[in-house]
Amino acid sequence: MNITQQLCCPGAAENQDYIRLGEDIAMVVDGSTPLVKDPRVPEVREYVRLLADAVVGAEGEDLPHMVAAGIETLRRRCGVPPETEGVSAALAILRETGEQVEVFVLGDCAAGVRFRDGRGPELVSQEAVSRLDGAVVAEMCRLHRERGIDVIEARQLPEVREMLLRHRRMMNRPGGYWIAGFAPEAARHGSHRVYRREELSRVVLFSDGFSGQREALLGAEEPCLQELYQQLRQREAADSRCNRYPRLKPGDDVSGIVALF
């Protein structure tokens, strides 16, 4: 595979996204700030780097096994049980081994796959986190209408904060959502695809900050990440209170990788 583009830009002062590139692997990691801090675990920016290094350095027959091994390595390093609440991260990983190409997604990162024969494109994603976030945004919009406040103001209200906390407690539990934290079992719940190298033309990995550009990322033969990023930031700047384009926060971290075959 040939990595032709990469982008990793912050939505606020601290960028919690991370990109890791290796000889045969590419990885987007989207870290999440814990609602309750645990002194035993690293800060988000350190966690995403440690997790990426642990996954890339893990031994395993496929990406789900490598992700599980990487999470377990990090869990032991921190000396915490699997159910530890704290930092977490969504993943989108691409790995080439000979004539085989794997794509793995966990959480709300995603991958867009295009084929040489024109079929598709195919989106590899998981919707559990997006559904929960969508429910929160819907509640923020309801409060916006009923109380005459900006959508972004509604996030600070007790009922919205409690909703966010309730959703976070569903992490890595049946009926909730699965994401990289400290539970290796989460890797079994990722979306895993295996392709023949010869059938692929392009794969794009992206964090949920790019979710609004899904159609462009999937549809273009080779999307320009920088151009899409600039369009996104312009739209956000024109709607800083989140009233026109309701969302959880004014701007999110944005990451993407384009690989050609």
Regions found by a protein language model. Name each.
Residues 1-261:
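PP2C/PPM-type serine/threonine phosphatase catalytic domain
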